[in-house]
Structures are given as structure tokens and as C-alpha cells.
Amino acid sequence: MDITTNDLNHDDHHTPHGWKRWLFSTNHKDIGIMYIIFAIFAGIVGGLFSLLFRLELAMPGGTFLNHDFQLYNVLITAHAVIMVFFMIMPALFGGFGNYFVPLLIGAPDMAFPRLNNISFWLLVPAFILLMGSAFVDGGPGTGWTLYPPLSSISGHPGAAVDMAIFSLHLTGLSSILGSINLIVTIFNMRAPGMGLFKMPLFVWSILVTAFLIILAMPVLGGAITMLLTDRNFGTTFFKTDGGGDPVLFQHLFWFFGHPEVYIVILPGFGIVSQVISTFSRKPIFGYQGMVGAMVIIGFVGFIVWAHHMFTVGLSYNALIYFTAGTMIIAIPTGIKIFSWIATMWGGSITFPTPMLFSIGFIILFTIGGVTGIILSNSALDRVLHDTYYVVAHFHYTMSLGALFTAFAGFYYWFGKISGKQYPEILGKIHFWITFVGVNLTFFPQHFLGLAGMPRRIPDYPEAFAGWNMVSSIGAGISMAAALYFVFIVFYTLKYGKDCPNNPWGDGADTLEWTLTSPPPFHTFETPPHIEE
């Protein structure tokens, strides 16, 4: 791709300074940076919560939290909601999406800059509401799924669950507004000559994700609003004594909840495609197949939601359909895995930190995918449902998969964002500590699940003690790795070497590498022309 660009030095024009620059910012780069900082902060908080309940689970007896099992449930709930809505989505979709989509398509900014500002700032009150809910009336001990009747006014009297519901309303609104912005930007603001099928795969992944958010989030909003009125205004959507059905809530929640796991992982797929192509010095293998796989994953993700509900009493035909549909998702996912491997095959591969995290992602995601095939079988799921086998499965895919893509993207683009290049040896140490830590945490949970240990239980028989101790040690290592990552960020900002325009060489051929590091405040005011 021959790229001609006009590097304008208007950095200082119309740039507000101090706190106003960040509070009132309509610049996509500033907002992307704020999303990433917010995500790192929320991720540390959510990680500390998980460390607390892993310490509780390290030994049987329930002594660490002093037998306060409501607190245990609140920690479980807060950990999940923070990691999904306040860590991984703001990092991948909000942070990298906002910062790099305009750069990758040659746009001067996002289509609706002020909408972009409110999309970010809605997250802050949402996070405060969620944190505050933990200190009100014992906190929301419902799990992130908020199932009634546990989340009903009889199961949780007081304002805690209502605050959590309003928190989800705000974060959902933030996501929907951000999605509208990104869709309009991608369709209307591409540089001349950049057709849809010339866009980098990261842009495609954000586009598909944005459509998923717009289709899925309102369903969650409707479900939790119905729960809110059940709790406060006497409706009986989910109360059996008034003709309602709590299983209806599960259908509504998981109709959002299953697309949500693809909302979390799809931007990561895009990042991995960019990174593997760059460090294999080859174009991505099967570009159109990769695009098609993402679109198919997005579509099929909407029609398999009840595989989360195999034990609620679905009809035999429904079990067959949802089992088959879930297994079919393995096909487009397999296309992506094999295309990444084919891209590396025969390439001039180097292994800097972003590439290590991408390869680590492929390994972890494949393990999680294999256990997903096992869980998709409704007969086997009767045994494994709500055990630690499920916890291991979704952490290997949604959590470790998405987390490793976030780290890959961060190390890949950190020099471009900050103008400082991280020390390679520190990044590689971070990768290996994280890789060992997360596998030590979650791999033993497969064995616990197969042995029958249920999820969300603060105490357990001594037979499960060994693997739980291993898992808790792994959680400590993983948390240490996360804090080490924060150290690397600050160390790089203070002592890092200046990053060249393109630190990665010939393989990095997308538009952002034609700009300075960091890019000027206003970029592509004259659109670049994309030629074959």
C-alpha cells in the first residue's frame, strides 16, 4: 500500500491546557487515553476484589472474610461487573477504538466529538454508583447476572441492587453512544481510496462490535428496568405470585449476555490480526475470510443465548438447537485461529512483547474454545453447569483471551500513544509472569469443576483444598504481574527512549505509523490518499 500523507504541525492550535483539556476534550486521542487510564484503574480494583475472594478460597473454613458470605457474594458481583463493563470494554473498544480507528482510516477525528466526550464521562458516575452500592444495605450479592428472586426486593431489600442497576444503565448508554459514533465514523469518514475491504482488520472488528452493542445493550436495559419496576413499583414481570416468570429474566439477560462475550473479544481479534501481520512481515492470511468470520461470529452469537440455561427446564428440541448452534460457532472461530497460524507460517517472525501476548492469546483462547465445545453439549452441561469448569472456560476465553489482546495492543501502540518506547526486556518479563500466573490460577479449576466443586460458594470440603490453594497462589502471581505492568507504564513514561514514527519496521504498514510519535493534536486534516 503506497501511502502519501501530509504531516501538518498544528499541534498547538486550539489546544486547551491543564484539567480543561481532559474534562472538556472532544479530541479522539485524548478521550482514548482517558478510556485506557480508566480501564487500568478499574482493572486493578477488580483484580484486588478477585484476590480477596481467592484468599478466602485458598483454604476451607471460610476464615479470611470472617464468615461474611454476603461480602463474598458482593466481591464476586463487583469483580465481574468491573472487569466486563469498566475494564475490558473501555480498554479495547473505548480506548483503542477511539484512539486508533480515526488514525487507521485517515479520518481527522470521530464523527461526533462531543458525543465522544459524554460517552467517556458517563462511565465515571456509573463506576461510582457500582462502588457505592457495595457499601449500602450489605451490597448487591447477586452475581453479575442479577437473577431474580435473589435480586428481587425480597431477596435484596434496600438500595444496593437498584444502584447497581442504574450503574449498568449508565455504562450501557455510554457503550451505545460510543458505538453510534464509531459506526458513523467508519462508514462516512474513511480516506479517499479506502474501501471497506481495504480497512485494517482492527477497524472491522470495532465495526462488528459496535453493531453488537447497539443490538444487545437495549435488551439488557429493558431486563434490568423490568427488574427495577418489580423491586420498586409493584410490577410482577419476574414474580411467580403475580403471573411472572424468573426464567424470562434469564432469557432477556443472556440474549444480551452472550453477544456481550463477543463484544469483549472481537476488538481483541482485530488487535491480534494487526500484531501478527506486523511481526510476521506478511499480510494477514485470508483477509476476507477473517472479515466474514467476525460477521458470522457476531450473527450466530445472538442465536445461542440459552446455552447458559441448559438446566432451567428447556424443551428437548430447544436443547438440541442450542447445542448445535453453539458448536457451529467453533467454525468461524477456527477460521480465525488457523488464519493467524497461516499468517505466521513462512513469515520472518520476530518476538517482541506484543507478539508474545498474541501467541499467548492464541494458546489460551484455543484451550478455552475446546472446553467451550465440551460445555456446548447440553447433556454434559447438566453435570458441569455452575461448576468451576465453567469458570475456567470463560476465563480462558473472555478474560485471559481479551486480557492478553489488551496487553498486546498496549505494547504494540504504547510508543505511538506516548512517544516513549517501553524497554523490551521489562515487557517480556511481564508476559511470562502473567502467563504463568493466569494458567496457575485457572487451569486447576478444570479439575475442581470435573470433581464437582460449585461456583460462587465461599467454603468447600477439604477434598478440594489442594487445587484451590494452587489457584489462589496463581491469583497472587497474576496480581503481582498487574502491579508490575503499572510500574512498566510509569517507568516508560519517565525513562523510556523516544519512540520513532515506526518502531516495528516494514511489517507495520497501516496509516498510524506514517505519523509522528505521539501524533500531533490534529491529524489528517488533509485526508491521505490510499493507493493500491
Swiss-Prot record:
InterPro entries: Cyt_c_oxase-like_su1_dom, Cyt_c_oxase-like_su1_sf, Cyt_C_Oxase_1, Cyt_c_Oxase_su1_BS, Cyt_c_oxase_su1_dom, Cyt_c_oxidase_su1_bac
Entry keyword Ribosomal protein: no
Pfam family for this entry, one: COX1
Biological processes annotated in GO: electron transport coupled proton transport; oxidative phosphorylation; respiratory electron transport chain
Catalytically driven reaction(s): 4 Fe(II)-[cytochrome c] + O2 + 8 H(+)(in) = 4 Fe(III)-[cytochrome c] + 2 H2O + 4 H(+)(out)
GO CC list: plasma membrane; respiratory chain complex IV
Keywords: Cell membrane, Copper, Electron transport, Heme, Iron, Membrane, Metal-binding, Respiratory chain, Translocase, Transmembrane, Transmembrane helix, Transport
Gene Ontology molecular function terms on file: cytochrome-c oxidase activity; heme binding; metal ion binding
Keyword Ligase: no
Location of the protein in the cell: Cell membrane
Bilayer disposition of the protein: Multi-pass membrane protein
Annotated EC: 7.1.1.9
Binding-site list for heme a3: 393
Binding site for Fe(II)-heme a: 79, 395
Binding site for Cu cation: 258, 262, 307-308
Parts of the chain that traverse the membrane: 33-53, 74-94, 95-115, 118-138, 163-183, 200-220, 252-272, 284-304, 318-338, 355-375, 394-414, 431-451, 473-493
PANTHER family on file: CYTOCHROME C OXIDASE SUBUNIT 1
Family, as annotated: Belongs to the heme-copper respiratory oxidase family.
Biological function: Cytochrome c oxidase is the component of the respiratory chain that catalyzes the reduction of oxygen to water. Subunits 1-3 form the functional core of the enzyme complex. CO I is the catalytic subunit of the enzyme. Electrons originating in cytochrome c are transferred via the copper A center of subunit 2 and heme A of subunit 1 to the bimetallic center formed by heme A3 and copper B.
Protein name, UniProt field: Probable cytochrome c oxidase subunit 1
